[in-house]
From Swiss-Prot:
The keyword Oxidoreductase applies. Keywords: Antibiotic biosynthesis, FAD, Flavoprotein, FMN, Oxidoreductase. This is Isobutylamine N-hydroxylase. InterPro entries: Acyl-CoA_Oxase/DH_mid-dom_sf, AcylCo_DH-like_C, AcylCoA_DH/ox_N, AcylCoA_DH/ox_N_sf, AcylCoA_DH/oxidase_NM_dom_sf. It comes from the Bacteria. GO terms for biological process: antibiotic biosynthetic process. Its EC number is 1.14.14.30. GO terms for molecular function: acyl-CoA dehydrogenase activity; flavin adenine dinucleotide binding. Coiled coil: none annotated. Inhibited by 5',5'-dithio-bis(2-nitrobenzoic acid) (DTNB) and 4-(hydroxymercuri)benzoic acid (p-HMB). It catalyses: 2-methylpropan-1-amine + FADH2 + O2 = N-(2-methylpropyl)hydroxylamine + FAD + H2O + 2 H(+); 2-methylpropan-1-amine + FMNH2 + O2 = N-(2-methylpropyl)hydroxylamine + FMN + H2O + 2 H(+). Exists in dimeric or trimeric form depending upon buffer conditions. It can form an isobutylamine N-hydroxylase two component enzyme system formed of a flavin reductase component (VlmR) and a monooxygenase component (VlmH). It comes from Streptomyces viridifaciens.
Length: 378
């Protein structure tokens, strides 16, 4: 398929050999619990996609990022979901370094290791809870000498067994005593961090979405990124940008899975040409929406406009994916469905987009307010 080939070409340019290495494993092995896809991703430079070139990464723009994610989703939906968590976290952390005055030496040294060493970033935020903000604090921090003690849990937490750094959002007092959002950088091997089984579905099991618990985990002050008196709103601004990255990338991951199903229909000439054209139109409308927002972000659209565009695309695509699944499975036929468990898997793998925050119900009043000329508050 033309547009999927373009996505694969982008992935090959930025992560040479990654798709080929993944395809050496059967789909269901790629998707299973204990799958090596994250090791393969790490070995082929996957960690550096959104890391700036100054830190040894690719510094990819939004369009390249959604295309890479789509290519991964067509090959391994589990990996695409996990890669989204790493990449949107990287996008936020490295955006923060541009506005920290100055970043601590420890922060710079740690972030400079991400791309060269293939360090994977997990997020301790709310991306698995539909009706919440993705950056809703999920960890409590207690001040101690030289830092804070963190307690809490995140479930599900993708990359739980492969992460090198866990990030979280916490509410801490600033120099004036005001409560503000801060982001601690927590080494995954810190005493007090443990991983526990949580994900029981076979769908997306390869994303390692288990429970991560923090019990009396010490994080030094020098590894806490927080607001500054001369720029108190910087974290709020960056939350908006991070929100857009998350929605674009997670949508692209599921568009990739839909692309794999559609490609099978095209390759097997299933149904009439009119049927295949209708399916292709459904898919390409989802691709066009996602890539259109990515182009806008690349070209400078930001703030409320970018958030509204990303959410509009995400919810429109979410509805389209269900139609693509139904139509593709019908065209591929009952015998194919019975004989090929991969088809049932791919069809099921399109639906979890609806479970990522924010939920359509909770977002609706805010979108209506924005569509009617008011501000957008998510």
């Amino acid at each position: 398929m033309r547009s999927l080939d373009a996505a694969r070409d982008t992935c090959e340019r930025l992560h040479p050999g990654l798709i080929k290495a993944l395809e050496e494993l059967p789909l269901l092995e790629r998707e299973a619990e204990g799958s090596p896809v994250l090791d393969i991703f790490r070995a082929h430079g996957g960690a550096g996609l959104l890391v700036p070139s100054a830190y040894g990464g690719h510094g990819a723009d939004a369009l390249d990022a959604v295309r890479v994610t789509r290519a991964l989703g067509a090959c391994s939906p589990s990996l695409a979901a996990a890669a989204t968590m790493h990449n949107f976290t990287a996008a936020m952390l490295f955006a923060l370094t541009d506005r920290v005055i100055p970043p601590t030496d420890e922060q710079k040294k740690l972030l400079a290791r991400v791309a060269p060493e293939g360090m994977l970033l997990a997020s301790g935020w709310a991306e698995g809870r539909t009706q919440q903000d993705i950056l809703n604090p999920s960890v409590k921090a207690t001040p101690v000498d030289d830092g804070f003690i963190l307690n809490g849990s995140k479930k599900p937490c993708s990359l739980s067994r492969s992460m090198d750094i866990l990030t979280a959002s916490v509410i801490l007092p600033d120099e004036t005593g005001q409560q503000s959002l801060a982001v601690p950088l927590i080494m995954a091997d810190s005493p007090g961090i443990s991983v526990h089984p949580f994900w029981e579905s076979p769908v997306l099991a390869g994303s390692q979405s288990n429970e991560v618990r923090l019990k009396d985990v010490h994080v030094p002050e020098k590894l806490i990124i927080r607001g500054t008196p001369d720029d108190p709103g910087r974290l709020d601004d960056l939350q908006t940008a991070t929100f857009v990255w998350f929605e674009l990338l997670i949508t692209s991951a599921y568009v990739g899975a839909a692309s794999a199903l559609t490609e099978l229909v095209m390759e097997r000439d299933r149904g009439s040409v009119t049927d295949r054209a209708a399916l292709g139109i459904q898919l390409e409308s989802a691709v066009g929406l996602t890539e259109g927002v990515a182009r806008a972000v690349r070209d400078g659209v930001f703030g409320e406009e970018a958030v509204a565009a990303a959410l509009t695309a995400r919810f429109a695509v979410q509805k389209t994916l269900a139609a693509i699944s139904d139509q593709a499975i019908e065209l591929l036929g009952g015998i194919a469905f019975i004989k090929s468990p991969e088809l049932a898997y791919l069809s099921s793998a399109l639906h979890p987009l609806a479970f990522h925050p924010p939920g359509r119900t909770s977002s609706s009043p805010h979108l209506v307010e924005y569509f009617s000329g008011g501000p957008l508050e998510i």
